[in-house]
Design a protein with these regions (language model features):
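Short glycine/proline-centered loop/turn elements that form peptide/ligand docking sites
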Residues: 254, 277-280, 301-302
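Conserved donor-binding loop and adjoining core beta-sheet/short helix segment
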Residues: 8-16, 24-108, 214, 219-236, ...
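Flexible, substrate/cofactor-facing loop regions flanked by secondary structure
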Residues: 41, 151-233
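Conserved hydrophobic beta-strand within the GNAT/NAT acetyltransferase core sheet
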Residues: 115-119, 235, 269-273
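Short amphipathic alpha-helix that is part of the acyltransferase structural core
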Residues: 1-45, 156-189
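A structural microfeature
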Residues: 72, 138-141, 220, 293
């Protein structure tokens, strides 16, 4: 049986590199996002331009195996009390998950009314550990789809006056940030947010595909991320301005992003959506995924 020790996250570059490698390797070898995607971790670290090192230190916790290698970590995406507490583990260290949950229960006792953890519907091992500790399955929260990007796709025709571009060509980042702010109703998405995000190690503005309106404004986006070690990718975010929806703009942007990822050696790309009945699921099914996994939220009062 493996033995583990837990450690505070110190916000060091070396720790971040270990966390990134664990995610890229576990997801890349299986071809499915068992853990967070590498791009989600990069966004967590770099897009939160106003988050202090002290705040970051309180959002993750590490576990190491008997030889000091990173076995897994817990992480939360936001500082909100109701945000999910995620378990990220190496496949050969799944037995650490009980210790992780025990630590989370101690850490947040009296601070949160309940703990929420995500678990894929086909992950019987984690579900068993959660049940044994008194968690209950609450509801589905998201769908994860995989796509074969080695398959060349025909471009999706755009309405008259609209055209494809990317953020290596379109320089008005404030205008781009307004697109996401409006589409997601999130005023945090501004120029400072974008400039932080663009410092991510695997940010490539040529993969940040956008659609420009006849007036030259960005109105849709499919942002591709690619890591070259395992040739895995993610498209995140995907959105369209409310005034320009139902024109197949997002489908055109995603298709272009797929083809650009393929040209750079991408093998598989993942897109995450809200759970049903989120309307985005219809678009993502039309794109013919090769795999679909649903994540559920589990909860326990503490």
């Amino acid at each position: 049986m493996n033995t583990y020790t837990d450690h505070d996250y110190t916000y060091s570059d070396a720790e971040f590199a270990e966390m990134w490698q664990l995610l890229a390797e576990t997801n890349g070898r299986d071809g499915r996002p068992f853990n967070w995607t590498f791009s989600r971790l990069e966004n967590w670290r770099f897009a939160s331009w106003d988050r202090s090192p002290e705040e970051f230190r309180g959002m993750a916790h590490l576990w190491r195996d008997g030889v000091g290698r990173l076995a897994g970590f817990t992480i939360t995406e936001h500082l909100d009390i109701g945000d999910d507490l995620e378990l990220q583990t190496r496949p050969d260290c799944r037995d650490v998950e009980g210790e992780m949950l025990e630590w989370l229960e101690r850490r947040y006792a009296g601070e949160r009314p309940e703990l929420t953890v995500t678990c894929f519907t086909d992950d019987d091992r984690r579900a068993g550990v959660l049940r044994s500790r008194g968690f209950r399955e609450a509801r589905p929260i998201g769908n994860f789809r995989a796509y074969d990007v080695t398959r060349r796709r025909l471009p999706v025709p755009l309405p008259g006056g609209y055209r494809l571009s990317d953020l290596s060509e379109f320089a008005d980042v404030a205008a781009y940030a307004r697109l996401e702010a409006v589409a997601f109703n999130n005023e945090y998405c501004d120029e400072r947010w974008y400039r932080g995000k663009s410092l991510s190690p695997h940010y490539d503005p040529r993969l940040h595909v956008i659609v420009l309106s006849p007036d030259g404004e960005p109105v849709s986006v499919a942002h591709g991320w690619l890591e070259e070690q395992f040739c895995t990718a993610e498209i995140d975010p995907v959105c369209t301005h409310p005034d320009h929806r139902r024109k197949h703009l997002a489908e055109a942007a995603i298709t272009e992003a797929f083809n650009r990822l393929s040209a750079r050696g991408g093998r598989v790309a993942w897109i995450v959506s809200g759970a049903e009945p989120n309307p985005s699921n219809r678009l993502y099914e039309r794109l013919e995924p090769t795999g679909l996994w649903t994540a559920h939220r589990w909860a326990k009062a503490v």
